[in-house]
A protein has these predicted regions:
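Structural transition elements
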Residues: 325-363, 384-391
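Aromatic- and charge-enriched surface segment that lines or borders ligand/interaction sites
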Residues: 104-146, 295
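Ligand-site clamp/hinge motif
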Residues: 194, 223-268, 406
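N-terminal lobe/hinge region of extracytoplasmic solute-binding protein
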Residues: 56-109, 201-202, 521
């Protein structure tokens, strides 16, 4: 693939788009170009008659480890899949069940060997066939450069024969097919490489032509798409991290649809000019305790925090009901969910008693407890691009103050850097799709174990490690579900996490948009079905 520099062009495009956003914030357009942009987005056609679509997203940015669309880098696979550039061997359907996507099917030959047959006729957007050899090369590159994927997939070797790929794992990996539906598993043409701006060649309905991190991504129709007609000719994905700016852009017609809209803005769009597509998801808003913090390492403090967060009010009031209260890591709607789990509930008086018994008292009467001369202050690290997280921080700050805990909020786009320093924070509060693969393994392997890449708080449990070994060698689904429930209960008993709520995810679009459908695993957004009717 030709390497691209184009820094001057990228800068000019960035400035032009910034001007468009600023124009959308005012009551009047400052020139005709903004009017033209708004009209084009609203009608879905440009002057050449091509169908165009503009999508605003608060989360497509470096803050969320999505600086490019290269699935072999960090969490960029999400953007690759969401925006229709890449597709995976397997996918999760609307019922959260695993099914083949660019694969035709698979077979477990023995506990260490899997055979995957690919669909005939699938090709990359450059016209090259997506055969077993191409998939093998892609997965080899993935596990060579992506630490999390290498740990998940446990691939020892592979063999390619036409449309049949045989995978040998180094150890038993019952969830291998689920992991191959993970966004990092987007199959790309690695022979084409990655451009300087992070563009790859996939098998999806759209082809990326231009990417400026934290600003925009441009896509065009894949003329070689293997799975039917693609309706939209050109798409622009705009990074609009500020919720108010996103709302103004959709109102003014600068964009056709939006992801990540602030709940406070929803009433603006509850009319016949707009439409919502919504679904309950497993995206959990959670508190992760830092065991390296002397304060949070105190069992009583973690227990009090768990009892000092009012989950019900957070969902009903601050989220306007667009969510549901969590017990464990997974929603009740899945077989390994939270219906039989026991978690601490909001109980300020019990929290006060726990702290009092542990020696945390308010001796100077300032409302904040102290022990051995140290104030009970919690440094709350979170980030703003998920509109719900600053709301959760403010709610917890209020309720925890009532029990004598001071909360210092740091909502920053630099959270990924800060959390690497365990001395810089006490609790990390984020959002994660905990069962986007239709299987429980991924959450534990990523966040909770000694070898986990996102075990930010250095949590360790002998019991959890033993259960994880058992889970990773168990193929029976019923047994796996029960092990996952036991693992969640261990986390709750240790107060290692507080699972606050699950997201009811919505995308809002103009009324003339069709084929934009929210999905429970939050992976699939811009598909070949997307269309827009002229108004």
């Amino acid at each position: 693939m030709k390497k691209r520099t184009g820094k001057i062009l990228a800068l000019l495009l960035s400035l032009t788009m910034m001007a468009g956003v600023m124009a959308g914030c005012g009551s009047e357009k400052t020139d005709g170009s903004a009017d033209s942009t708004s009209t084009q987005a609203a009608t879905g056609a440009d002057t050449t008659g091509k169908k165009t679509f503009v999508f605003g997203d608060t989360t497509f940015n470096a803050e969320n480890e999505e600086s490019t669309i290269d699935p072999h880098s960090a969490y960029c696979g999400w953007a690759c899949m969401r925006y229709g550039v890449g597709e995976t061997l397997m996918k999760i359907n609307d019922s959260m069940k695993l099914e083949p996507w660019i694969a035709e099917g698979y077979e477990l030959v023995d506990n260490l060997t899997w055979k995957i047959t690919l669909k005939d006729g699938v090709c990359f957007s450059n016209g090259k066939p997506c055969d077993a050899e191409a998939v093998k090369k892609c997965l080899e590159d993935l596990i060579a450069v992506h630490e999390r994927a290498a740990g998940d997939l446990k691939i020892a070797s592979m063999e390619a024969d036409g449309l049949v790929l045989t995978i040998h794992t180094a150890e038993e990996c019952p969830s291998l097919m689920n992991y191959l539906s993970e966004p990092y598993g987007c199959i790309i043409d690695v022979d084409e490489g990655v451009t300087d701006d992070g563009i790859v060649v996939g098998t999806g309905p759209y082809v990326a032509t231009e990417l400026v991190t934290d600003d925009h991504l441009k896509l065009v129709k894949n003329e070689n798409y293997w799975d039917g007609n693609v309706n939209i000719d050109e798409i622009t994905v705009r990074t609009i991290s500020d919720g108010d700016t996103l709302a103004l852009a959709l109102q003014s017609g600068e964009i056709n649809a939006a992801y990540g809209m602030a709940y406070a803005s929803y009433p603006i769009f509850e009319n016949d000019k707009f439409q919502f597509t919504s679904v309950q998801t497993s995206r959990s808003f959670y508190v992760q305790m830092n065991y390296a913090s002397p304060v949070v390492a105190d069992d009583a403090v973690r227990e009090a925090i768990a009892m000092g967060i009012d989950k019900e009010s957070f969902v009903k009031v601050l989220l306007n009901g667009y969510g549901y209260v969590a017990t464990g890591a997974f929603p009740d709607t899945v077989a390994f969910g939270g219906s039989t789990l026991h978690a601490k509930t909001y109980d300020p008086e019990a929290a006060k008693a726990v702290l009092e018994e542990a020696g945390w008292t308010d001796s100077d009467g300032d409302g904040i407890r102290e022990k051995d001369g140290q104030k009970l202050t919690i440094r709350w690290l979170t980030y703003p691009s998920r509109q719900e997280l600053p709301l959760l921080a403010e709610a917890a700050q209020s309720t925890l103050k009532e029990i004598g805990i001071e909360v210092q909020i740091n909502a920053t786009a630099d959270h990924n850097t800060i959390c690497k320093d365990p001395a810089a924070w006490d609790v990390y509060v984020g959002a994660n799709v905990n069962c986007g693969l239709g299987d429980p393994t991924n959450f534990f392997s990523t966040h909770c174990l000694d070898a986990s890449t996102k075990n930010r708080g250095q949590y360790h449990s002998d019991e959890l490690e033993e259960l994880a070994v058992k889970l990773n060698s168990t193929f029976d689904v019923t047994e796996r579900n029960q092990i996952a429930i036991e693992m969640q209960q261990q986390l709750l008993d240790d107060d290692a996490f507080v699972f606050c709520s699950f997201l009811k995810m919505s995308m809002i679009s103009q009324a003339n948009v069709t084929g934009l459908t929210a999905h429970a695993c939050d992976y699939y957004e811009l598909t070949a079905d997307l269309d827009i009717n002229e108004v």
